[in-house]
């Protein structure tokens, strides 16, 4: 991959694609800025590194080569002068780059600005009864530079409830509505409950949670922690604030709002699900997305789209939800990096929590900003999104997000009985069981264009499915199964008795078994029966 800048016939950077992301090759030899998530158990590769240019940038890949990629660039106002990137420029700024790298490596969770002149820290422990709040008022001009908190819990369920029942509200400069309204756990960047991780502006550690967003105000700030649950909560908190380094005029108020389905999917914009919609002048700084996906399978094929200042076509449009959050290939494994993390996982079945903070790549807007992400699966039967959006907004701007009732914040994620391919799944099988859309392998070849897909299991594992017989009688049994290059050898049984012999599902290509596989004749009584699938092994040719 070669990068050409400002019309030069010679590339400013000429490297193998993989070398951009290993943290070892100059000028990107900073492992906190150039990294492979494979090294921490996930998948995907990222490079956070400024490459300035004055006139033009052209990025060229080798002929007949391709991969998934995203490039983020920003255009400065006319008249702005920047140096053209080269290896020598990177050496000149090596001290600053090393400073950032070292901070990311060892000091996340501390203010990157260090101790600020004139800063003050308020520390307290509050007992907040149900329906009550703890309140703190500050006089400006100042900026809140850190909020930290810690609670004790009875168990995981209590933890999940408390972090959604407690709400942080912050009102700036006498405004009628709070600019910050967010369940406490989501404000600290993850959900549900407490999930330990560190990013640049937010994190949760053994010592408690932190948020390091810079939150300036001109005259006053009212900070409230409201208990909308049924249990008294004891909260230990710290709040650090400091004088402004410049007049408040020209700065923006920090906004942080939690929401679910505030803007329903519209027919003309389906499947765009709103992350943030706001009017005025400001900067978009990112989101945390809590996904509830009881159906299992991949939830996030949708692309992100950012419409700035009334654009009819988005200036940012992505390639998939996991790509936006900085990882790849639907990988559910945890990772934590300064600007993006996967902080909670249930293997893409159940809860997933991901975040992407736009700090170096924040998105400025003068009139309006709309950010959305495509959501292909409907709320019923069960894929639900909850979003925490963070942005700065000049006074007088429009923030359309109001408070969300407590019954819509906690307990809405109920696990339905597991079902896949039309079969109720009994018990908790090993691996992952889901319904897979088979349209891409041939329209009409499978009933309802889908099948039950069992992955992540090993020889000896069993999958039990419920079969309902409507009338007692003698039945000739058969099954249509799918064959593929990576499928195994299975044995089917009904109510503990084997049906025919082992079935080899290997084939170099994805096909249904036609004609259906004969399974013999059985006398079956009316009611429920159990069909068992056992993995025996695999064909030597299978991959």
Region roles according to the model:
Residues 1-419:
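Beta-strand-centric surfaces of beta-sandwich/beta-rich domains
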Residues 304, 408-543:
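Extracytoplasmic
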């Amino acid at each position: 991959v070669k990068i050409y800048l400002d019309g030069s016939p010679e590339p400013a950077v000429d490297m193998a694609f993989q070398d951009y992301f290993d943290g070892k090759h100059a000028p990107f030899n900073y492992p906190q800025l150039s990294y492979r998530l494979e090294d921490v158990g996930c998948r995907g590769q990222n490079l956070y590194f400024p490459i300035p240019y004055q006139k033009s940038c052209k990025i060229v890949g080798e002929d007949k080569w391709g991969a998934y990629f995203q490039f983020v660039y920003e255009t400065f106002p006319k008249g702005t002068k920047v140096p053209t990137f080269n290896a020598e420029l990177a050496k000149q700024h090596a001290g600053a780059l090393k400073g950032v790298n070292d901070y990311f490596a060892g000091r996340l969770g501390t203010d990157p600005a260090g101790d600020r002149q004139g800063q003050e820290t308020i520390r307290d422990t509050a007992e907040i009864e149900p329906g009550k709040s703890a309140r703190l008022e500050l006089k400006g001009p100042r900026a809140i530079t850190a909020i930290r908190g810690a609670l004790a819990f009875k168990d995981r369920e209590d933890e999940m409830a408390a972090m959604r029942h407690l709400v942080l509200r912050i009102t700036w400069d006498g405004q009628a509505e709070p600019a910050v309204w967010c369940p406490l756990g989501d404000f600290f960047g993850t959900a549900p409950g407490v999930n330990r991780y560190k990013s640049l502006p937010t994190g949760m550690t053994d010592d408690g949670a932190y948020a390091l967003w810079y939150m300036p105000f001109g005259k006053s700030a009212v900070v409230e922690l409201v208990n909308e649950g049924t249990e008294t909560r004891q909260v230990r908190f710290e709040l650090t604030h400091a004088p402004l380094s410049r007049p408040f005029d020209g700065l923006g108020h920090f906004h942080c709002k939690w929401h679910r389905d505030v803007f329903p999917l519209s027919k003309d914009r389906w499947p765009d699900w709103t992350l943030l919609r706001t009017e005025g002048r400001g900067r978009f700084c990112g989101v945390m997305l809590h996904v509830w996906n009881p159906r299992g399978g991949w939830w996030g094929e949708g692309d992100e789209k950012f419409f700035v200042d009334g654009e009819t076509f988005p200036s940012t449009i992505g390639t998939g939800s996991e790509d936006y959050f900085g990882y790849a290939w639907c990988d559910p494994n945890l990772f934590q990096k300064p600007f993006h993390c996967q902080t909670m996982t249930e293997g893409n079945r159940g809860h997933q929590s991901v975040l992407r903070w736009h700090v170096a790549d924040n998105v400025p807007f003068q009139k309006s900003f709309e950010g959305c992400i495509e959501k292909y699966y409907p709320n019923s039967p069960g894929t639900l999104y909850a979003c925490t959006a963070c942005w700065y907004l000049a006074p007088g701007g429009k923030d359309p997000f109001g408070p969300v009732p407590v019954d819509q914040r906690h307990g809405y994620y109920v696990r339905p009985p597991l079902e896949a391919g039309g079969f109720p799944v009994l018990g908790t099988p090993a691996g992952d069981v889901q319904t897979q859309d088979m349209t891409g392998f041939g329209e009409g070849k499978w009933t309802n264009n889908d099948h039950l897909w069992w992955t992540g299991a090993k020889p000896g594992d069993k999958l039990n499915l419920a079969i309902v017989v409507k009338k007692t009688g003698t039945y000739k049994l058969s099954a249509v199964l799918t064959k593929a290059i990576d499928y195994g050898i299975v044995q089917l049984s009904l109510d503990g008795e084997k049906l025919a012999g082992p079935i080899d599902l290997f084939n170099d290509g994805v096909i249904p078994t036609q004609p259906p596989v004969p399974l013999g004749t059985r006398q079956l009584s009316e009611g429920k029966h159990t069909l068992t699938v056992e993995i025996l092994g695999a064909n030597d040719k299978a991959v």
